[in-house]
């Protein structure tokens, strides 16, 4: 009797472990959709950057996938970007361009939310900040109105990147209502970074 009870207990525990370890994916997305979403995110950055060079992504990952309906979803991506040797006017595919080399070439960390329908990109929101490991922590980049510029003379450009956050702090896209309350200009934005004026990000 005791052996039977012990056997039932073992089966119960193993069964509980099985159900807690297995899970249901939020959405069984096609890898091609991920590639399309990443390409659209990089294209959004390059379309709003004032750098003379194109940016290219690397170290990308999917953070979340939400199914909106049978044919629509949103993807939250995180990736890093760096300037390439291709100039903007070349209209080249950034994925085919070589990265610029050198210790002082900065790296930016970006998060994007991409809405897709019928495997086609509908909307893209991207927000980036300079990586603390890239050596781009100058005070000029902490002011509102700085836009993603070139690594050699980016202070001559308006940089659209927010000041760097701590690695463990999440990065969120402000809502439209928040941006209405804090219009473009020299007004300070209430945030955890002292003396920093924050850009609402790429949109």
From Swiss-Prot:
Phosphoserine PTM sites in chain numbering:
90, 138-139, 166, 175
Q: In which tissues is it expressed?
A: In liver and bone but not in heart, lung, kidney, or spleen.
User: What domain of life is recorded for the organism?
Assistant: Eukaryota
Give the record's keywords alphabetically: Disulfide bond, Phosphoprotein, Secreted, Signal
**Coiled coil, from the record:** none
Primary localization: secreted
Extent of the signal sequence: 1-23
Q: Which family does it belong to?
A: Belongs to the SPP2 family.
The entry's function note states: Could coordinate an aspect of bone turnover.
Identification of the protein by name: Secreted phosphoprotein 24
Q: What is the lineage of its organism?
A: Eukaryota, Metazoa, Chordata, Craniata, Vertebrata
């Amino acid at each position: 009797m005791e052996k039977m009870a012990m056997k039932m207990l073992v089966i119960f525990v193993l069964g509980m472990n099985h159900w807690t370890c297995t899970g249901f994916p939020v959405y069984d997305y096609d890898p091609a959709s991920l590639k399309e979403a990443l390409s659209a995110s990089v294209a959004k950055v390059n379309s709003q950057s004032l750098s003379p060079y194109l940016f290219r992504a690397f170290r990308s990952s999917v953070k979340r996938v939400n199914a909106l309906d049978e044919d629509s979803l949103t993807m939250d991506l995180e990736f890093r970007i760096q300037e390439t040797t291709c100039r903007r006017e070349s209209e080249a595919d950034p994925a085919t361009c070589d990265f610029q080399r050198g210790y002082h070439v900065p790296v930016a960390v970006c998060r994007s939310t991409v809405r897709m329908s019928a495997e086609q990109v509908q909307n893209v929101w991207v927000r980036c900040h300079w990586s603390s490991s890239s050596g781009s922590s100058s005070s000029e980049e902490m002011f509102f109105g700085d836009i993603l510029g070139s690594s050699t003379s980016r202070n001559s450009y308006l940089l659209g990147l927010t000041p760097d956050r701590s690695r463990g702090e999440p990065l969120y896209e402000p809502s439209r209502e928040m941006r209405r309350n804090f219009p473009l200009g020299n007004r300070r934005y209430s945030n955890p970074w002292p003396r920093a004026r924050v850009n609402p990000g790429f949109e």
